């Protein structure tokens, strides 16, 4: 009887250690995979950054100058001001939109809404709504 109890205890210990070693080996394998993916992502991010620098220098890209900013915003301000002073221009523009233009602008709107929604889901880390603690705990 003593012998069966002792062997049962040793068998349980052996099974527990086997389960622990299996879990440890799986965790090590997962860690190696994550490290490999991370190293790959860092490498390609560096390559992309260096390529971007070379393109920036070769193409002669530069941020817009102050005069360019001023001209763009001045034109935008004048357009908004003219539409505010003459509302009939807005109606004429709306009437001149064709079916293909309406479809194109609708597609753009859906894309923008989709990207906004994706950003919201990423920010919340939840697809539907925010996680709110229940009122039962109060």
Curated annotation (Swiss-Prot):
Keywords: ATP synthesis, CF(0), Hydrogen ion transport, Ion transport, Membrane, Mitochondrion, Mitochondrion inner membrane, Transport. It is found in: Mitochondrion inner membrane. One of its GO terms (biological process) is cristae formation. InterPro entries: ATP_synth_F0_gsu_mt. GO terms for molecular function: proton-transporting ATP synthase activity, rotational mechanism. Its main location: mitochondrion. One of its GO terms (cellular component) is proton-transporting ATP synthase complex. It comes from the Eukaryota. Belongs to the ATPase g subunit family. F-type ATP synthases have 2 components, the catalytic core F(1) and the membrane-embedded component F(0), linked together by a central stalk and a peripheral stalk. The central stalk, also called rotor shaft, is often seen as part of F(1). The peripheral stalk is seen as part of F(0). F(0) contains the membrane channel next to the rotor. F-type ATP synthases form dimers but each monomer functions independently in ATP generation. Mitochondrial membrane ATP synthase (F(1)F(0) ATP synthase or Complex V) produces ATP from ADP in the presence of a proton gradient across the membrane which is generated by electron transport complexes of the respiratory chain. F-type ATP synthases consist of two structural domains, F(1) - containing the extramembraneous catalytic core, and F(0) - containing the membrane proton channel, linked together by a central stalk and a peripheral stalk. This is ATP synthase subunit g, mitochondrial. The gene is ATP20.
């Amino acid at each position: 009887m003593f012998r069966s109890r002792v062997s049962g205890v040793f068998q349980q210990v052996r099974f527990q250690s086997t389960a622990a070693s299996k879990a440890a080996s799986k965790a090590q394998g997962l860690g190696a995979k994550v490290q490999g993916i991370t190293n790959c992502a860092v490498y390609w991010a560096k390559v992309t950054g260096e390529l971007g620098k070379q393109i920036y220098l070769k193409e002669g890209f530069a941020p817009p100058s102050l005069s360019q900013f001023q001209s763009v915003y001045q034109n935008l301000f004048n357009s908004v001001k003219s539409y505010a002073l003459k509302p009939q221009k807005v109606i004429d523009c709306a009437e001149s939109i064709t079916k293909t233009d309406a479809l194109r602008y609708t597609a753009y709107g859906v894309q923008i809404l989709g990207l906004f929604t994706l950003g919201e889901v990423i920010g919340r880390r939840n697809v539907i709504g925010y996680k709110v603690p229940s009122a039962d705990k109060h």
